[in-house]
């Protein structure tokens, strides 16, 4: 009685394949080899051609699995190593499984492994796929409660699917109303190792490397009209330190006392879904305020969280691009934004002196420097020539080829040398409009650098020297600015972004991205603050008491509707036998046996038994039970049970062969 039924074993094997398959994307290949070996062993045990492993064999297998995790991950702790250990235990449990209790443990391990998979991929496609292993695991769970003589797996699968559909209303209620509790602890996500994106320091060629990447940085949806593309400068961080080669971020502080700015111009409101970056800063237009309680506006006007962004983050922002930022600055900030190395780049310093002597007003000097970039033969490229120790000199006077970081770094250097406080801002510019969802896609190749310089009474002013060399980069995007450049998206040769010239393929790409965006915005982003806003909007807010009453009422309503669906009280009980008879006739009609007008039930059953001799006992049992119930005293077997037995006994596939009466005969 405690043996594992064949149907349950079949679905356990199928479920293991479906559970393990998505994990193989980030797990060592020996996991797949381990499953193949253990599955073959378990099948041989079921066929009584092999025995269960002994204690020393199980110990050896466990030690080998642990050694494999250590060699492939370098540790036995942490989320990455723990996931591999979980899958290894899930596989090894299959071999030692003897009783139904062991099988239950395996099923619950499978459900847990499905949930762990969301830590590595929580996209829409992964969520859709997870329905397959969950259904198979539920079928295995149902199979464990069935008779050992049940041999067909498909009815069990249909029952599992039906149970999942019945659970949908309760799932939706819990999703909408169950309080979101914060985690007790957090771990860095292993999937974010080697994330492509901006870093806290910048050499001239660093941002150019991002032009080779097609990875997504974030998505943005505006309330109202979309601003012009040339106004979309997404600030990430500000770089104020320069060592002669690299620009780097200086220490920043936050707080109302540290920020001096005034709102001016129209307010822009928008939502951002940011991809994991493993960095603490958020992307926003100037000057930004957000609804994130753990995020602050820093003294250089960039948004920063307390913790790095290790998973997709949804946040709302209000920005004032025309705001006045620091009409006066303290001496420390001024000194930091005038700082230059003592030596190096003499020609750039001489150019700064020349411009300062020719232009008394700082804005005139800035305009003259921009005009120099515009009129002289500078080139915009992802693969500029290498420069020496005096990189600014080499770029301005020799190579004259570079990416946005070259132009921003060189301009900030010259402005500082001319006595104008200046700094480099790193972030993203522009974005691709997805008309299917009316939102912007900002990719890593949209990474950009520009310059801010400070003027009394006017505060920090933004200027982009790249616009003077390649205006199409700002107005149309990087693809238009680098048409024909082999380095563009060089790290993504198969990216659909390379084929935006094919309308049908581009439309498919945007439609799929819109589906993913909706999943992330309305499902993954439905957390504490978003849930509170939803409840406030539709229910005027819910305290714990009202929430409990609402959930209780919803649960009672769901159970009542489910009971109505299952019991169908509107169908009269007196007509039950007629419905069973009609089901019996439809079942045989599916196999080519239609009841003739005026043909009695017993004659119909005898004819069906001749055509389907293998199912003759089941047919006779139903006819006998039906006649006893209809014409006897109701003490015989339930014909409904006999009908289900007949349905299980009928063959899956039949081939028609001619008979003497010409009606045809079905053979398995």
UniProtKB/Swiss-Prot annotation:
Conditions for induction: Is expressed in both exponential and stationary phases of growth. Appears to be part of an operon together with PA2874 and PA2875.
Gene Ontology CC annotations of this record: plasma membrane
EC number assigned by the record: 2.3.2.13
Localization in the cell: Cell inner membrane
Recorded topology in the membrane: Multi-pass membrane protein
Catalytic activity: L-glutaminyl-[protein] + L-lysyl-[protein] = [protein]-L-lysyl-N(6)-5-L-glutamyl-[protein] + NH4(+)
Signal peptide: none
SMART domains registered for this protein in UniProt: TGc
Keyword Cell inner membrane among UniProt keywords: yes
Top-level taxonomic group: Bacteria
Record topological domains on the Periplasmic side: 28-50, 96-103, 180-548
UniProtKB keywords: Acyltransferase, Cell inner membrane, Cell membrane, Membrane, Transferase, Transmembrane, Transmembrane helix
Keyword Cell membrane: yes
Reported consequences of knocking out the gene: Disruption experiments show that tgpA is essential.
Membrane-spanning segments: 7-27, 51-71, 75-95, 104-124, 125-145, 159-179, 549-569
Active site per the UniProt annotation: 404, 448, 464
Annotated Pfam families: DUF4129 (PF13559), TgpA_N (PF11992), Transglut_core (PF01841)
GO molecular function: protein-glutamine gamma-glutamyltransferase activity
Domain free text: The transglutaminase activity is contained within the periplasmic domain (180-544).
Protein name: Protein-glutamine gamma-glutamyltransferase
Species assigned in the record: Pseudomonas aeruginosa (strain ATCC 15692 / DSM 22644 / CIP 104116 / JCM 14847 / LMG 12228 / 1C / PRS 101 / PAO1)
Gene giving rise to this polypeptide: tgpA
């Amino acid at each position: 009685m405690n043996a594992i039924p064949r149907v349950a074993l079949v679905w356990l094997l199928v479920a293991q394949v479906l559970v393990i398959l998505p994990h193989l994307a980030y797990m060592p290949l020996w996991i797949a080899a381990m499953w193949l070996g253990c599955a073959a062993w378990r099948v041989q045990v079921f066929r009584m051609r092999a025995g269960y492993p002994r204690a020393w064999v199980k110990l050896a297998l466990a030690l080998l699995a642990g050694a494999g995790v250590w060699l492939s991950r370098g540790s036995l702790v942490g989320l990455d190593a723990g996931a591999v250990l979980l899958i290894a235990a899930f596989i090894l449990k299959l071999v030692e499984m003897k009783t139904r209790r062991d099988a239950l443990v395996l099923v619950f391990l499978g459900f847990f492994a499905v949930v762990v998979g969301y830590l590595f991929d929580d996209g829409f496609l992964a969520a859709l796929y997870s329905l397959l292993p969950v259904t198979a695991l539920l079928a295995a769970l149902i199979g464990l409660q069935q008779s050992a003589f049940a041999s067909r797996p498909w009815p069990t699968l249909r029952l599992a699917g039906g149970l999942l559909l019945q659970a949908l209303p309760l799932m939706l209620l819990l999703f909408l109303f169950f309080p979101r509790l914060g985690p007790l602890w957090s771990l860095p996500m292993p999937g974010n190792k080697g994330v492509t994106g901006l870093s806290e320091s910048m050499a001239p060629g660093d941002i150019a490397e991002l032009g080779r990447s097609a990875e997504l940085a974030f998505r943005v949806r505006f309330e109202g009209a979309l601003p012009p593309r040339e106004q979309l400068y997404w600030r990430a961080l500000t770089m104020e330190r320069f060592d002669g080669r690299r620009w780097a971020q200086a220490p920043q502080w936050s707080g109302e006392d540290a920020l001096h700015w005034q709102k001016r111009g129209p307010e822009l409101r928008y939502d951002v879904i940011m991809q994991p970056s493993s960095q603490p800063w958020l992307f926003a237009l100037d000057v930004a305020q957000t609804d994130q309680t753990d995020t602050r506006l820093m003294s250089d006007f960039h948004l920063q969280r307390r913790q790095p962004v290790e998973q997709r983050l949804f946040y709302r922002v209000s920005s004032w691009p025309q705001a006045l930022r620091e009409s006066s600055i303290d001496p420390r900030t001024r000194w930091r934004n005038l700082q230059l190395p003592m030596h190096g780049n003499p020609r750039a310093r001489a150019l700064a002196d020349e411009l300062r002597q020719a232009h008394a007003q700082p804005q005139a000097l800035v305009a003259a420097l921009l005009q120099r970039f515009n009129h002289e033969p500078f080139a915009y490229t992802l693969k500029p020539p290498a420069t020496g120790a005096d990189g600014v000199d080499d770029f301005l006077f020799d190579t004259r080829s570079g990416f946005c970081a070259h132009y921003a770094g060189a301009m900030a250097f010259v402005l500082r040398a001319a006595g104008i406080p200046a700094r480099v801002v790193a972030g993203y510019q522009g974005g691709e409009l997805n008309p299917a969802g009316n939102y912007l896609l900002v990719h890593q190749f949209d990474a950009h650098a520009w310059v801010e310089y400070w003027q009394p009474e006017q505060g920090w002013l933004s200027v982009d020297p790249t616009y003077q060399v390649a205006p199409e980069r700002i107005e149309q995007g990087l693809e238009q600015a680098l048409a024909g450049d082999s380095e563009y998206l060089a790290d993504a040769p198969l990216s659909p972004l390379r084929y935006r010239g094919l309308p049908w393929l581009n439309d498919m790409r945007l439609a799929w991205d819109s589906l993913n965006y909706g999943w992330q915005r309305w499902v993954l982003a439905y957390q504490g603050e978003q849930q509170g806003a939803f409840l406030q909007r539709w229910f005027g807010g819910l305290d714990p008491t009202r929430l409990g009453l609402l959930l209780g009422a919803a649960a009672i309503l769901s159970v009542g509707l489910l009971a109505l669906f299952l019991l169908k009280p509107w169908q009269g009980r007196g007509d039950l036998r007629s419905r069973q008879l009609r089901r019996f006739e439809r079942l045989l009609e599916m196999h080519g046996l239609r009841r003739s007008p005026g043909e009695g039930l017993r004659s119909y059953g005898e004819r069906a038994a001749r055509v389907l001799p293998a199912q003759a006992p089941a047919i006779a049992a139903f006819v006998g039970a039906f006649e006893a119930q209809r014409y006897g005293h109701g003490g015989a077997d339930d014909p409904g049970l006999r009908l289900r037995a007949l349905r299980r006994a009928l063959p899956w596939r039949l081939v028609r062969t001619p008979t003497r009466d010409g009606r045809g005969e079905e053979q398995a």
